[in-house]
């Protein structure tokens, strides 16, 4: 019995050794200039794109997040992972806020691994320093049977839907009904439509102001032109009056000269007659 037990123990040990040898570790790769620091292959593999999470990509959601507004950077380190996880799994991203800030966020997301097929919609607003991001990965068609999930992504964020808010890591199915989602989407669209209408009204006011300014300039030019024409006419009239005055003066002088000449001739005749009568 002891011999049989020893044989069984030896066989068991041999099996363990063989199984351990069959699961040997993968060969390591030595990096340049670091010959004494082995690195596993998995740590240096490069991917052409960031893979999607199997659960999150199939979970319909719609999230409204208030993004921070820092002067020197966009996101804190603790916010980067969750924000990019949300952006990367979205099909549509709407950014509302300051025009320069929302453009910075769009370029930042696209330059740091966000999928190229994500549709970005930028809605600039006035007097709003922060940025609101609305991210969704579901079809808002009323016939869509999928129920969107809401998440509390960042601390201080405001979920867009009021039904059973879940954490982004939970992947729990929300109890939000499709009708509520449609109503929320309709309200957001109405808000965006108000923003668009505001900008249209602002543009119309600017155009009206420009038209009024051009009309005022035209009226001023016409007034100046009329004044210049009036002044020219006055100058012409004054010139004519002066000219006519000179002509009248010359005519009067000529008349006086003629009268003087006539007086001299008459005086000469009278003297001749007196001489004849006196017999001289």
Swiss-Prot record:
InterPro entries: Cag12. A lipid is attached at residue 21 (N-palmitoyl cysteine). Its main location: membrane. This is CAG pathogenicity island protein 12. One of its GO terms (cellular component) is plasma membrane. It is found in: Cell membrane. A lipid is attached at residue 21 (S-diacylglycerol cysteine). Residues 1-20 form the signal peptide. It is a lipid-anchor. The keyword Cell membrane applies. Keywords: Cell membrane, Lipoprotein, Membrane, Palmitate, Signal.
């Amino acid at each position: 019995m002891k011999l049989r037990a020893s044989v069984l123990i030896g066989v068991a040990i041999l099996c363990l050794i063989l199984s351990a040898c069959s699961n040997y570790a993968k060969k390591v790769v030595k990096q340049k200039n670091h010959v004494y620091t082995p690195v596993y292959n998995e740590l240096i593999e490069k991917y052409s794109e960031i893979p999607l999470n199997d659960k999150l990509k199939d979970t319909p959601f719609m999230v409204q997040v208030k993004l921070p507004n820092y002067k020197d950077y966009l996101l804190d380190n603790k916010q980067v992972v969750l924000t990019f996880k949300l952006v990367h799994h979205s099909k549509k991203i709407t950014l509302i806020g300051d025009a320069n800030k929302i453009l910075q966020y769009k370029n930042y997301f696209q330059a740091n691994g966000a999928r190229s097929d994500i549709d970005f919609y930028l809605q600039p607003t006035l007097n709003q320093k922060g940025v609101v991001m609305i991210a969704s990965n579901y079809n808002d068609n009323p016939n869509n049977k999928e129920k969107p999930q809401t998440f509390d992504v960042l601390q201080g964020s405001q979920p867009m839907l009021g039904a059973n808010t879940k954490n982004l890591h939970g992947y729990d199915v929300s109890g939000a009904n499709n009708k509520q989602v449609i109503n929320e989407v309709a309200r957001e669209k109405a808000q965006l439509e108000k923003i668009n209408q505001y900008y249209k009204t602002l543009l119309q006011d600017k155009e009206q102001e420009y038209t009024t300014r051009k009309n005022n300039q035209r009226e001023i030019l016409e007034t100046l032109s009329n004044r210049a024409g009036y002044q020219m006419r006055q100058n012409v009239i004054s010139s004519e009056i002066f000219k006519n005055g000179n002509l009248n003066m010359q005519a009067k002088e000529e008349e006086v000269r003629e009268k003087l000449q006539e007086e001299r001739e008459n005086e000469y005749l009278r003297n001749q007659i007196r001489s004849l009568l006196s017999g001289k």
